[in-house]
Amino acid sequence: NQKVNGKTYTLTLDGDFHMFYYRTDVLNRFSQEPPKTWDEWFKVAEAIHGKDYNGDGEPDYASCAFKRRAAQSYFTIWSVAAPFIQTKGTSQGVFFNVDTGKPLINNPGFAEGLRVYKKMGDYGPPDELNMDIADVRSMYLKGRCAMLIEWGDTSPLALDSDVVRNLWGTSQMPGSTRVWNRDTNRLENCNPTLCPHAINGINHAPFGAFGGWSGYINKN
C-alpha cells in the first residue's frame, strides 16, 4: 500500500508476483500449448517429461519447483493452491477468512492444491524436495527443466544463458475450472457467481509471493 490517508509514502518498485515459465522450443517439438490450468499442466508434463531438452543425451524434467523445507517452498504451495481457494478477488482472502481470521487450510481447495503440489514431483528431479530457488534456477538455465514457477528474475538471467536464450516464454500461473465453494464446502465447477473474475471459465489468483519492494526517501 503506497498511501496512508490519501498521502503517498512509498513508490512500488517490484510486485514480486510468481510467473509461469516454459521452454517454447520443447512445447513446440511435442505439439503442446502453454497450459492455462493445472489439469492442462499435467497433460503437457506427461507429454514432454524424460526427453532430452539440451542435447546432452540425458533425460530432462518437465518441471523444476523449489520445495526445500524451511526455505521458500511455502511460496510454491501457495501459488499452486491459490486459484482453488480464492475466487472473488483479494477482498475474499486466501490465507485467512477475512471475517473470522480462521486459517484457510482445512478445506477442499487447499487439499486440492496439496494434491497438485505433490503430483508435480512425478515430473521433476528426484531430489526436488531438497531444492531451493537457486537450484531450480540453475537447472532451468542449463536446459534441464521445461516448466518453472519463478519470479521475474529468471527473465534477465535467461538472456545470459547460451542454452535457453530466446527459447522461453512466460504467462500467468495456471488456474482451475474447479474451485472451492465456501458455502457448500465442496470443489465445484466455475460459474459466473462462483468465479466472477474467471477468464473463459478458468479462475486465476495471482500470488504476490514475497510481497514486493518499494522505495522511499527519508525526509531527514
Name what the model sees in each region:
Residues 18-22, 215-217:
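Short glycine- and hydrophobic/aromatic-rich loop-to-beta-strand nucleating segment
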Residues 38-44, 127-142, 175:
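Short helix-initiation/N-cap motifs at beta->coil->alpha
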Residues 6, 29-30, 122, 161-220:
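Extracytoplasmic/periplasmic substrate-recognition and gating elements
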Residues 2-13, 18, 42-102, 143-145:
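Extracytoplasmic/periplasmic solute-binding protein
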Residues 45-47, 89-130, 172-178, 189-199:
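Glycine-centered hinge/linker elements that transmit conformational signals in sensory
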Residues 146-151, 169-170:
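Paired acidic/hydrophobic, glycine-rich loop segments that form the ligand-binding mouth/hinge
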Residues 25-26:
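Short, well-ordered alpha-helical scaffold segment located
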Residues 7, 29-33, 102, 118-132, ...:
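A local structural motif
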